[in-house]
Amino acid sequence: MKTSPHRNTSAIVDLKAIRNNIEKFKKHINPNAEIWPAVKADAYGHGSIEVSKAVSDLVGGFCVSNLDEAIELRNHLVTKPILVLSGIVPEDVDIAAALNISLTAPSLEWLKLVVQEEAELSDLKIHIGVDSGMGRIGIRDVEEANQMIELADKYAINFEGIFTHFATADMADETKFKNQQARFNKIMAGLSRQPKFIHSTNTAAALWHKEQVQAIERLGISMYGLNPSGKTLELPFEIEPALSLVSELTHIKKIAAGETVGYGATYETSEETWIGTVPIGYADGWTRQMQGFKVLVDGKFCEIVGRVCMDQMMIKLDKSYPLGTKVTLIGRDKANEITTTDVADWRGTINYEVLCLLSDRIKRIYK
């Protein structure tokens, strides 16, 4: 989807806020650990290239989801180490090796396919993934891990790291977290040899389980200023949201009592009402569930009325406003604020999803 630069709907990204959030984490975590920010999914909607360049001097490397995301960073002259967190097809490992991109090795079966595909593997770096209870990818016992290490050594593959991912580090009940931690530690204790990087700390673990000593801290959602638990757990220090979402009024009208607004005629006015149209819709990631939610106009809350359309939505105004008046969907306007977590709670989802659904059609403005 193409960005729409001629439409005044924008995600404003504060790169200084992201840098400040990283600096606060550096004071909170093990001082010997490297921070490797997660810039996957276009840096959670903030812009992976711009974010990576803005924070490169503060971090040891970057984490992405797939090989294409890593290649994009390399193509834009991001030179720090990059780790692909998901498995890739074995026939593409030569691309990763040539670009100095580290790969997740999710299983012995995958590694066997890699050595069958490629004759020269000395430039390949792998991090063995451990499934300690997430149930996604990774090995589940030390025997498989040691077989992978042996196979890597045989073909001169660089066994650079090993890691796991916690499923419940952002929850008050620590039972599952401690079970995963114990499983991972047991596998680490049984390895035939230790790699350069052992890492299990995601954002939530870095915030609420900082007793872990890790070589890498994989920093995600809180780098962008959001609480990974939503509102469940209190943050140990303040962070600043880096993204605000704004648009404008493109049409304003007064309609009579008894008129309807939007597809399905789901909203009917009970009195004469000022209605404003805003150029954002579900094609931009502002989903249909947002009907009934509020936005800010001149610092005042205004209800979204009628169904959110593909490209536009309508809001109930307290009075007439000039065309071009700013509408804040996420962010602060005067004394009031709408957070990404507020939007997530309304939708019954998580703040991560709200950010990641903001489509490329919304232009990003960096400050």
Curated annotation (Swiss-Prot):
Residue sites binding substrate per the record: R136, M310
EC id: 5.1.1.1
Entries under CDD domains matching the protein: PLPDE_III_AR (cd00430)
Catalytic activity: L-alanine = D-alanine
Modified residues (N6-(pyridoxal phosphate)lysine): K40
Keywords in alphabetical order: Isomerase, Pyridoxal phosphate
Single GO cellular component term: cytosol
Molecular-function annotations in GO: alanine racemase activity; pyridoxal phosphate binding
Cross-referenced Pfam families: Ala_racemase_C (PF00842), Ala_racemase_N (PF01168)
Biological process terms in GO annotation: D-alanine biosynthetic process; peptidoglycan biosynthetic process
Active-site residue numbers: K40 (proton acceptor), Y263 (proton acceptor)
InterPro entries: Ala_racemase, Ala_racemase/Decarboxylase_C, Ala_racemase_C, Ala_racemase_N, Ala_racemase_pyridoxalP-BS, PLP-binding_barrel
Pathway(s) it belongs to: Amino-acid biosynthesis; D-alanine biosynthesis; D-alanine from L-alanine: step 1/1
Cofactor(s), by name: pyridoxal 5'-phosphate
Entries under PROSITE patterns matching the protein: ALANINE_RACEMASE
Practical uses of the protein: Homoalanine fermentation combined with the disruption of the alr gene allowed the industrial and stereospecific production (>99%) of L-alanine, which is used as a food sweetener and for pharmaceutical applications.
Domain of life (superkingdom): Bacteria
Record function comment: Catalyzes the interconversion of L-alanine and D-alanine. May also act on other amino acids.
Family: Belongs to the alanine racemase family.
Protein name: Alanine racemase
Organism: Lactococcus lactis subsp. cremoris (strain MG1363)
Gene of this entry: alr
